[in-house]
Design a protein with these regions (language model features):
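Bacterial N-terminal signal peptides
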Residues: 6-15
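Autoinhibitory propeptides
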Residues: 29, 33-96
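C-terminal subdomain of the subtilisin-like protease fold in secreted/lumenal serine endopeptidases
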Residues: 48, 208-219, 226-227, 240, ...
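Protease zymogen maturation seam
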Residues: 69-119, 127, 132-133, 333, ...
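Subtilisin-like serine protease catalytic core
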Residues: 106-140, 147-198, 210-213, 246, ...
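Hydrolase catalytic cores
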Residues: 161-164, 184-190, 205, 213-214, ...
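Substrate-binding/access-modulating region of protease and related hydrolase catalytic domains
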Residues: 186-277, 287-289, 331-348, 364, ...
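Acidic, Ser/Thr/Pro-rich low-complexity intrinsically disordered segments
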Residues: 375, 398-401, 410, 439-545
Length: 545
């Protein structure tokens, strides 16, 4: 252990009396090391030696008053606290899984903890259900494209499933990161490699109804807001994802690889990662860089996870084509694309596994609180960490930064406040119905994940609505939409605007109302939007007259 080694070294360098204690004396910025050392020795009568560029080691019978000496930042007694190694998997190939250490998968625990079992849906190409790594790990499996979900001719689904839920400490092979997970396997990939949208939508619905806590979607289609002919947005897919979100399921999706986009790296996340409340995941390499294949996005790229040179399971029917290869059932014995596999698909799987561990460690947290925690505790990626294309803070390349499971598990602060109106992102059935004449409601907005909250308010003919927005810490706007509005996100809907706030800005209270009473009875939609990067809580008061 590091602590024992440090103590042994200091014992050789700094012998002291039997009743002496050892202290670390921190140096204030700009302090003269020699002057501080001399002052400490004179004050305590002890022995001082260098400990680090920012601290001294003191052997003395006491350190009272040392913290008040000029140039001293702190005094800490050593030996009272220590650190221990996190629990280490015993699987023989775990040392080859660099991603486990990169995201500090097990660093929060000294030994394998008992976390609640939860179901994770892998919506992909199926699984080699007879693989030893998945013995007792598959809760259910279903194919939505024909054939058996318990067979995988492509290998992609088995690789993803291994990263998430291969058996831990079973004495063979690799270590699945999400050790509490039970797999729900949905096969949606046809023999030609295509994923029909209908199959994906049905699979999402099935996974939710089967009790999935996390859904992994290592698939996607091109998003291009500048060219609608190329943009692959699907209302069917969006509705299926929304069903999962409303059911409290964490949905994790890959932001996509540039090989399917007009250029590389592509500047937009793929669908379904580019849907509200989905955790979009980009990839980073062993050296800390974000590869060019990983799509960028300033809004929908939430976190980065390992997505290069990963090692996982493969169907034994595929690895058997190389009978002389020793690691049958693992990617070393697979075809070329699995010998040095790279892609945001695999990064999404790592993030899904992380979501399982964090949700298990915070069993009372809701979906949006877990995803907020994963983003809030991510480690910022910059040129100092190996990512030259990354900027300080959130950026389009790595989102909030590198996934850090231990930081999320051990997070010392409060969880994000609950927004019980979510998801209420659009008009129609996606809105939150305000039923009483006067309502006060607290909610929140997030520029990157939840830009709009929409409230449905029924007004009688000749009625009037006054809305008051308070306690917002970011720029927000209010828009009232007429009955019949299908979406607040379409430009062609602008003719349906009944009223809107002007120059709201960072104010404590915003008031607006219809200057004349409405001529048409019906359900109006009140949209609250955040208009700048950031997040804010707010209080909305609506009064119908």
């Amino acid at each position: 252990m590091r602590r024992l080694f440090a103590v042994a070294v200091l014992a050789l360098v700094l012998p002291g009396a039997a009743d002496a204690a050892r202290y670390a004396v921190g140096l204030a910025p700009g302090a003269d090391r020699a002057a501080v050392a001399q002052a400490v020795e004179e004050h305590t009568g002890g022995r001082v030696a260098p400990l680090a560029p920012f601290a001294l080691a003191l052997d003395a019978t006491g350190a009272r008053g040392v913290a008040r000496l000029p140039g001293v930042a702190y005094v800490e007694r050593l030996g009272a606290r220590g650190r221990a190694l996190s629990f280490l998997p015993t699987d023989p190939m775990a040392t080859r899984q660099w991603h486990l250490g990169a995201v500090q998968a097990f660093d929060a625990w000294l030994q394998r903890p008992t976390l609640p079992s939860m179901r994770v849906a892998v919506i992909d190409s199926g699984i080699d259900a007879g693989h030893p790594e998945f013995a007792g790990r598959i809760a259910n499996a279903k194919s939505f494209v024909g054939g058996s979900a318990r067979r995988d001719r492509h290998g992609h689904g088995t690789f993803i499933a291994g990263l998430i839920a291969a058996s831990l400490n079973n004495g063979e092979g690799i270590s699945g990161m999400a050790f509490p997970a039970q797999l729900l396997v949905a096969k949606v990939v046809r023999p030609d490699g295509v994923v029909p949208l209908e199959a994906e939508a049905r699979a999402i619905r099935w996974a939710v109804d089967e009790g999935a806590a996390v859904i992994n979607l290592s698939l996607g289609g091109v998003r291009d807001p500048a060219d609608q002919s190329r943009d692959s947005f699907s209302p069917l897919e969006a509705n299926a994802v929304e069903y999962a979100i409303r059911s409290g399921v964490i949905v994790v999706a890959a932001v996509g690889n540039g090989d399917n986009a007009p250029e590389r790296p592509w500047r937009y996340a793929s669908y379904p990662a580019a849907l509200p409340h989905v955790l979009g995941v980009s990839a980073f390499s062993r050296d800390g860089a974000v590869p060019s294949f990983s799509n960028r996005d300033p809004v929908y790229n939430d976190v980065a996870a390992p997505g290069d040179e990963l090692f996982s399971t493969l169907p034994r029917a595929i690895t058997a084509r190389r009978p002389l290869c020793a690691d049958q059932g693992y990617s070393d014995c697979g075809p070329q694309e699995y010998l040095r596999p790279q892609g945001t698909s695999f990064a999404a799987a790592v993030a899904s596994a992380g979501a399982v561990l964090v949700r298990g460690a915070w069993p009372n947290a809701r979906r949006e609180q877990v995803t907020a925690l994963l983003q809030r505790t991510a480690t910022d990626m910059t040129s100092a960490t190996g990512c030259r294309r990354c900027a300080d803070g959130r950026d389009a390349v790595s989102g909030w930064g590198r996934l850090n499971v231990a930081a999320a598990v051990d997070y010392p602060g409060r969880l994000a406040p609950l927004d019980r109106t979510e998801p209420n992102d659009d008009a129609g059935a996606r809105s939150f119905r305000v039923r009483k004449p006067t309502v006060n409601r607290s909610a929140s907005l997030d520029f990157w994940d939840d830009q709009n909250d929409v409230y449905a308010v029924r007004l009688r003919r000749g009625g009037r609505l006054v809305a008051t927005l308070s306690r917002a810490s970011a720029n927000v706007s209010l828009v009232l939409w007429k009955p019949g509005t299908r979406s607040v996100n379409e430009r062609r809907s602008l003719a349906n605007v009944a009223a809107q706030s002007v120059n709201v800005g960072r104010v404590k209270v915003v008031r607006f109302g219809l200057q004349s009473r409405v001529r048409r009875a019906g359900i109006y939609y009140l949209q609250v939007s955040i208009t700048e990067p950031g997040a804010t809580a707010y209080t909305l008061r609506t009064v119908r007259r």
